[in-house]
Amino acid sequence: GVIGKELAKALPQYTDKTRLVSRNPKKVSEDDELFEANLLNSEETMKAVEGSEVVYLTAGLQYDINVWRTQWPLLMKNVIDACKKQKSKFVFFDNVYSYGKVDGRMTEDTPINPVSEKGKVRAELNKMIMDEVEKGNLKAIIAKAADFYGPETPLSFVNIMVFENYKKGKKAQWFIDVNKKHSFTYTPDAGKGTAILGN
């Protein structure tokens, strides 16, 4: 996805060895190593992680609650198990669904309080990671990001309703309460920030 691409662009600042793992991996930089794997398969995940000092998980699944409930915990278990076995540091790029409704700023101290079914799945994933960290079995950090905008995000709310309208000489549209603050994440910044967290 777009965050994986932006992360891959940022990683050469920290390492000369980047392995991109996907069902259909494509190079972002000339020196990228490509590794085809399905992270729902534990053996393929183990092989994909083998030899890695840092593992970044930026994968996405179909935006469907039934898929999320069944596939996300399995995928996460496979990645956690592989990182534990390989002694790899783990960086999970997550959204903010697990926070639920927040009045004010979101920080590392914001409580996990999901109000949606997808938020409950994300909270479960966060718990899976942090349980292993607290037991001393895993070094991990969870990056959180709000709604995206930026290059290669043509379907983002901001791109469609604001920037595309401006390009056409139209007024921007906004379907959110104009009196409430709403955070957005610029995708190149998300990639750079995620790279920093692993180094």
Feature names for model-found ranges:
Residues K118, A146-L155, I176-P188:
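Glycine-rich "substrate-gating" loop/helix at the edge of Rossmann-like oxidoreductase active sites
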Residues A123, G150-V162, L197-N199:
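Glycine/proline-rich active-site loop of Rossmann-fold NAD(P)-dependent oxidoreductases
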Residues G4-K5:
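N-terminal Rossmann-fold NAD(P) dinucleotide-binding loop
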